[in-house]
């Protein structure tokens, strides 16, 4: 399900069963993330699918990429794999107005 930036954040903030999934590349990830996100680069192909297999399908997944296209594709793949609830962030990280975390450089 596609959600606006505000609806995505509101649902996320009130969802104890939430998992944030970033499907961008590692280079994009290094430029900043939505706090507590898990990286699973959709461009990894089979590696992306293998990592999805390790996730709990009953959780609620809040998925984002840079602009919303890859995350929409990821949500469709996840739904086909049996994930019950996925939310795509419309506009992606490029339009994100919420908190941003950066990878620890230590």
Predicted region positions:
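Rhodanese-like catalytic fold shared by cysteine-dependent sulfurtransferases
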Residues: 1-18, 26-60, 69-106
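Short, surface-exposed ligand- or partner-binding patches at beta-edge/loop junctions that are enriched
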Residues: 63-64
């Amino acid at each position: 399900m596609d959600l606006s930036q505000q609806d995505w954040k509101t649902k996320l903030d009130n969802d104890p069963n939430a998992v944030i999934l970033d499907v961008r590349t590692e280079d994009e990830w290094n430029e900043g993330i939505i706090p507590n996100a898990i990286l699973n680069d959709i461009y990894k192909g089979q590696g992306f699918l293998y990592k999805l297999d390790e996730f709990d399908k009953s959780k609620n997944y809040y998925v984002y990429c840079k602009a919303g296209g890859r995350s929409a594709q990821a949500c469709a793949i996840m739904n086909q794999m049996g994930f019950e609830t996925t939310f795509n962030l419309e506009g992606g990280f490029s339009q994100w107005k919420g908190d941003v975390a950066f990878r620890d450089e230590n």
